Protein backbone atom coordinates (compact mmCIF):
# COMPACT_ATOMS: atom_id res chain seq x y z
CA UNK A 1 0.00 0.00 0.00
CA UNK A 2 1.39 3.40 -0.98
CA UNK A 3 -0.87 5.91 0.79
CA UNK A 4 -3.37 5.53 3.64
CA UNK A 5 -5.85 8.37 4.06
CA UNK A 6 -7.12 8.80 7.62
CA UNK A 7 -10.27 10.87 8.05
CA UNK A 8 -11.62 11.64 11.52
CA UNK A 9 -15.35 12.30 11.15
CA UNK A 10 -17.59 14.09 13.62
CA UNK A 11 -21.27 14.14 12.61
CA UNK A 12 -22.22 15.70 9.24
CA UNK A 13 -22.19 12.60 7.06
CA UNK A 14 -23.21 14.47 3.92
CA UNK A 15 -19.98 16.48 3.91
CA UNK A 16 -17.99 13.31 4.55
CA UNK A 17 -19.67 11.56 1.62
CA UNK A 18 -18.78 14.45 -0.70
CA UNK A 19 -15.20 14.08 0.49
CA UNK A 20 -15.18 10.32 -0.15
CA UNK A 21 -16.75 10.71 -3.59
CA UNK A 22 -14.08 13.22 -4.59
CA UNK A 23 -11.34 10.87 -3.38
CA UNK A 24 -12.77 8.06 -5.47
CA UNK A 25 -13.06 10.31 -8.52
CA UNK A 26 -9.46 11.54 -8.38
CA UNK A 27 -7.74 8.43 -7.03
CA UNK A 28 -4.71 8.06 -9.32
CA UNK A 29 -3.17 5.26 -7.22
CA UNK A 30 -6.13 2.88 -7.63
CA UNK A 31 -5.82 -0.06 -5.19
CA UNK A 32 -2.56 1.34 -3.77
CA UNK A 33 -4.64 3.88 -1.84
CA UNK A 34 -6.73 3.01 1.21
CA UNK A 35 -9.16 5.16 3.17
CA UNK A 36 -9.75 4.80 6.91
CA UNK A 37 -12.70 6.66 8.44
CA UNK A 38 -12.55 7.03 12.22
CA UNK A 39 -15.95 8.06 13.54
CA UNK A 40 -15.74 10.30 16.61
CA UNK A 41 -19.45 11.15 16.41
CA UNK A 42 -21.91 10.46 19.25
CA UNK A 43 -23.42 6.96 18.98
CA UNK A 44 -26.78 8.26 17.74
CA UNK A 45 -25.12 10.40 15.06
CA UNK A 46 -22.63 7.94 13.58
CA UNK A 47 -21.72 8.36 9.90
CA UNK A 48 -21.44 4.66 9.02
CA UNK A 49 -24.44 4.78 6.68
CA UNK A 50 -22.72 7.48 4.63
CA UNK A 51 -19.48 5.51 4.46
CA UNK A 52 -21.45 2.53 3.13
CA UNK A 53 -22.70 4.71 0.28
CA UNK A 54 -19.15 5.25 -0.94
CA UNK A 55 -17.88 3.09 -3.81
CA UNK A 56 -14.26 3.21 -2.65
CA UNK A 57 -12.89 -0.34 -2.66
CA UNK A 58 -10.22 -0.08 0.05
CA UNK A 59 -12.12 1.60 2.86
CA UNK A 60 -12.37 0.87 6.58
CA UNK A 61 -14.87 2.28 9.05
CA UNK A 62 -13.90 2.44 12.73
CA UNK A 63 -16.31 3.77 15.38
CA UNK A 64 -14.38 5.44 18.19
CA UNK A 65 -14.88 7.34 21.42
CA UNK A 66 -14.24 11.03 20.92
CA UNK A 67 -10.93 11.53 22.72
CA UNK A 68 -9.84 14.30 20.38
CA UNK A 69 -8.65 14.92 16.84
CA UNK A 70 -5.14 13.60 17.41
CA UNK A 71 -6.35 10.50 19.25
CA UNK A 72 -8.79 9.74 16.44
CA UNK A 73 -6.04 10.04 13.86
CA UNK A 74 -3.88 7.70 15.92
CA UNK A 75 -6.62 5.06 15.80
CA UNK A 76 -6.49 5.18 12.02
CA UNK A 77 -2.70 5.30 11.85
CA UNK A 78 -2.38 2.10 13.90
CA UNK A 79 -4.29 0.05 11.32
CA UNK A 80 -2.92 1.80 8.23
CA UNK A 81 -0.90 -0.14 5.67
CA UNK A 82 0.51 2.71 3.59
CA UNK A 83 4.10 3.93 3.46
CA UNK A 84 2.65 7.44 3.66
CA UNK A 85 -0.29 8.48 5.84
CA UNK A 86 -2.45 11.38 4.73
CA UNK A 87 -4.43 12.98 7.54
CA UNK A 88 -7.25 14.92 5.90
CA UNK A 89 -10.35 16.64 7.22
CA UNK A 90 -13.79 15.33 6.22
CA UNK A 91 -14.62 18.74 4.74
CA UNK A 92 -12.00 18.61 2.00
CA UNK A 93 -12.97 18.08 -1.64
CA UNK A 94 -10.48 16.93 -4.25
CA UNK A 95 -10.58 18.74 -7.59
CA UNK A 96 -7.64 17.01 -9.28
CA UNK A 97 -5.45 13.90 -8.90
CA UNK A 98 -2.83 14.43 -6.17
CA UNK A 99 -1.81 11.09 -4.68
CA UNK A 100 0.64 9.84 -7.30
CA UNK A 101 2.64 13.08 -7.13
CA UNK A 102 2.66 13.15 -3.32
CA UNK A 103 3.85 9.55 -3.15
CA UNK A 104 6.52 10.32 -5.75
CA UNK A 105 7.77 13.24 -3.64
CA UNK A 106 8.30 10.93 -0.66
CA UNK A 107 10.00 8.25 -2.77
CA UNK A 108 12.40 10.72 -4.39
CA UNK A 109 13.46 12.33 -1.11
CA UNK A 110 14.15 9.99 1.81
CA UNK A 111 14.41 12.99 4.16
CA UNK A 112 10.91 14.21 3.36
CA UNK A 113 8.87 13.77 6.54
CA UNK A 114 5.80 15.94 6.00
CA UNK A 115 4.09 17.39 2.96
CA UNK A 116 1.06 19.63 2.59
CA UNK A 117 -0.66 21.01 -0.48
CA UNK A 118 -2.52 24.19 -1.32
CA UNK A 119 -5.96 24.55 0.28
CA UNK A 120 -8.59 26.58 -1.54
CA UNK A 121 -11.91 27.96 -0.36
CA UNK A 122 -15.14 26.88 -2.00
CA UNK A 123 -14.90 29.80 -4.44
CA UNK A 124 -11.35 28.61 -5.33
CA UNK A 125 -9.66 31.60 -3.71
CA UNK A 126 -6.59 30.80 -1.55
CA UNK A 127 -7.31 29.33 1.87
CA UNK A 128 -5.02 28.68 4.82
CA UNK A 129 -2.59 25.84 4.13
CA UNK A 130 -0.06 26.80 6.80
CA UNK A 131 0.44 29.14 9.75
CA UNK A 132 3.26 30.68 11.72
CA UNK A 133 4.56 28.56 14.57
CA UNK A 134 3.49 29.79 18.06
CA UNK A 135 3.20 33.33 16.77
CA UNK A 136 3.34 36.39 19.06
CA UNK A 137 3.72 39.06 16.37
CA UNK A 138 0.79 41.11 15.08
CA UNK A 139 2.29 41.58 11.61
CA UNK A 140 2.36 37.83 11.11
CA UNK A 141 -1.35 37.54 11.90
CA UNK A 142 -2.11 40.31 9.43
CA UNK A 143 0.10 38.93 6.64
CA UNK A 144 -0.48 35.16 6.87
CA UNK A 145 -3.24 35.42 4.26
CA UNK A 146 -0.75 36.96 1.82
CA UNK A 147 1.88 34.32 2.58
CA UNK A 148 -0.66 31.62 1.79
CA UNK A 149 -1.82 33.36 -1.37
CA UNK A 150 1.75 33.53 -2.67
CA UNK A 151 2.64 30.05 -1.41
CA UNK A 152 5.57 31.35 0.63
CA UNK A 153 6.11 28.56 3.14
CA UNK A 154 9.10 28.61 5.48
CA UNK A 155 9.52 25.34 7.36
CA UNK A 156 11.72 27.03 9.97
CA UNK A 157 8.87 29.02 11.49
CA UNK A 158 5.67 27.67 9.90
CA UNK A 159 3.65 24.47 10.08
CA UNK A 160 1.31 22.66 7.69
CA UNK A 161 -2.31 22.57 8.86
CA UNK A 162 -3.89 19.30 9.91
CA UNK A 163 -6.54 19.57 7.19
CA UNK A 164 -4.10 17.97 4.74
CA UNK A 165 -1.04 16.56 6.44
CA UNK A 166 0.86 13.81 4.63
CA UNK A 167 3.57 12.13 6.74
CA UNK A 168 6.10 9.36 6.28
CA UNK A 169 4.59 6.56 8.36
CA UNK A 170 7.76 5.15 9.92
CA UNK A 171 8.86 8.58 11.17
CA UNK A 172 5.38 9.33 12.50
CA UNK A 173 5.13 6.04 14.37
CA UNK A 174 8.67 6.37 15.75
CA UNK A 175 7.75 9.60 17.55
CA UNK A 176 4.65 7.94 19.07
CA UNK A 177 2.16 9.59 16.72
CA UNK A 178 0.01 12.56 17.82
CA UNK A 179 0.09 13.63 21.47
CA UNK A 180 -3.31 12.56 22.81
CA UNK A 181 -3.10 15.11 25.62
CA UNK A 182 -3.94 17.67 22.92
CA UNK A 183 -7.66 17.39 22.21
CA UNK A 184 -7.64 19.78 19.26
CA UNK A 185 -5.30 22.45 17.79
CA UNK A 186 -1.47 22.44 17.88
CA UNK A 187 -1.27 18.66 17.35
CA UNK A 188 0.19 19.11 13.86
CA UNK A 189 2.90 21.56 14.92
CA UNK A 190 3.68 19.36 17.93
CA UNK A 191 4.23 16.20 15.87
CA UNK A 192 6.26 18.13 13.28
CA UNK A 193 8.49 19.47 16.04
CA UNK A 194 9.06 15.98 17.48
CA UNK A 195 9.87 14.51 14.08
CA UNK A 196 12.41 17.25 13.35
CA UNK A 197 13.99 16.77 16.77
CA UNK A 198 14.34 13.01 16.29
CA UNK A 199 15.39 13.24 12.63
CA UNK A 200 17.74 16.25 12.21
CA UNK A 201 17.63 16.00 8.40
CA UNK A 202 13.84 15.70 8.20
CA UNK A 203 12.20 18.08 5.74
CA UNK A 204 8.74 19.62 5.55
CA UNK A 205 7.45 20.54 2.11
CA UNK A 206 4.59 22.68 0.88
CA UNK A 207 3.64 21.60 -2.64
CA UNK A 208 1.86 24.65 -4.00
CA UNK A 209 1.41 22.95 -7.37
CA UNK A 210 -1.24 20.60 -5.97
CA UNK A 211 -4.54 21.78 -4.55
CA UNK A 212 -7.82 20.76 -2.95
CA UNK A 213 -10.83 22.58 -1.53
CA UNK A 214 -11.24 23.00 2.21
CA UNK A 215 -14.86 23.93 2.82
CA UNK A 216 -14.21 25.48 6.21
CA UNK A 217 -11.90 28.08 4.68
CA UNK A 218 -10.86 30.67 7.24
CA UNK A 219 -11.18 29.92 10.93
CA UNK A 220 -14.46 31.69 11.64
CA UNK A 221 -15.76 29.62 14.56
CA UNK A 222 -15.40 31.73 17.70
CA UNK A 223 -17.60 29.68 20.04
CA UNK A 224 -16.46 29.72 23.65
CA UNK A 225 -15.94 25.95 23.68
CA UNK A 226 -13.61 25.98 20.67
CA UNK A 227 -11.74 29.02 21.97
CA UNK A 228 -11.19 27.20 25.28
CA UNK A 229 -9.91 24.11 23.43
CA UNK A 230 -7.51 26.28 21.47
CA UNK A 231 -6.20 28.04 24.57
CA UNK A 232 -5.85 24.83 26.58
CA UNK A 233 -3.83 23.29 23.74
CA UNK A 234 -1.80 26.47 23.30
CA UNK A 235 -0.77 26.50 26.97
CA UNK A 236 -0.06 22.75 27.08
CA UNK A 237 2.02 22.91 23.89
CA UNK A 238 3.95 25.92 25.16
CA UNK A 239 4.78 24.28 28.49
CA UNK A 240 5.73 21.01 26.81
CA UNK A 241 8.11 22.69 24.39
CA UNK A 242 9.52 25.23 26.87
CA UNK A 243 8.07 28.19 24.98
CA UNK A 244 6.98 31.48 26.51
CA UNK A 245 3.34 30.49 26.84
CA UNK A 246 2.54 33.40 29.16
CA UNK A 247 3.62 35.85 26.46
CA UNK A 248 1.57 33.88 23.95
CA UNK A 249 -1.53 34.03 26.19
CA UNK A 250 -1.14 37.80 26.63
CA UNK A 251 -0.71 38.24 22.88
CA UNK A 252 -3.72 36.12 21.95
CA UNK A 253 -5.93 37.77 24.56
CA UNK A 254 -4.95 41.24 23.36
CA UNK A 255 -5.43 40.28 19.74
CA UNK A 256 -8.81 38.71 20.50
CA UNK A 257 -10.00 41.89 22.27
CA UNK A 258 -8.71 43.97 19.36
CA UNK A 259 -10.64 41.87 16.83
CA UNK A 260 -13.82 42.13 18.91
CA UNK A 261 -13.43 45.89 18.91
CA UNK A 262 -12.92 45.99 15.14
CA UNK A 263 -15.87 43.66 14.56
CA UNK A 264 -18.15 45.93 16.57
CA UNK A 265 -17.38 48.77 14.16
CA UNK A 266 -17.83 47.04 10.81
CA UNK A 267 -20.78 45.60 8.90
CA UNK A 268 -21.69 41.92 8.75
CA UNK A 269 -20.47 41.63 5.14
CA UNK A 270 -17.13 43.13 6.08
CA UNK A 271 -16.86 40.77 9.07
CA UNK A 272 -17.16 37.78 6.74
CA UNK A 273 -14.54 39.26 4.39
CA UNK A 274 -12.21 40.02 7.31
CA UNK A 275 -12.34 36.51 8.78
CA UNK A 276 -11.70 34.96 5.38
Model-based region annotation:
Residues 20-63:
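Acidic donor-binding segment of Leloir-type glycosyltransferases
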Residues 64-80:
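Glycine-rich, basic loop-to-helix element that forms the pyrophosphate-binding segment
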Residues 85:
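Short aromatic/hydrophobic "clamp" motif used to bind/position activated sugar donors
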Residues 97-129:
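Conserved donor NDP-sugar-binding/catalytic core segment of glycosyltransferases
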Residues 134-157:
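Short, flexible, basic/aromatic active-site loop/helix in glycosyltransferases
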Residues 158-177, 181-210:
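A short, conserved alpha-helix in the catalytic core of glycosyltransferases
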Residues 192, 200-224, 234-237:
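Active-site donor/metal-binding and catalytic loop motifs
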Residues 223-276:
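Non-catalytic, C-terminal membrane-associated alpha-helical segments of glycosyltransferases
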Amino acid sequence: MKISLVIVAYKNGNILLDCLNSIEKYNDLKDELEVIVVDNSPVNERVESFVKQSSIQNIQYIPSDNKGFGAGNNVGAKVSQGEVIGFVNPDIVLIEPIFKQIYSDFKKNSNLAIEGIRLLKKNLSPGYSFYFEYNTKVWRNWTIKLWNKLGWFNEKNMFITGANLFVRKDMFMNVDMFDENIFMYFEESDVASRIKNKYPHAEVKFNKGLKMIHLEGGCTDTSKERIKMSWDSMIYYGKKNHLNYKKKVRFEYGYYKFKKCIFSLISQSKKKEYTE
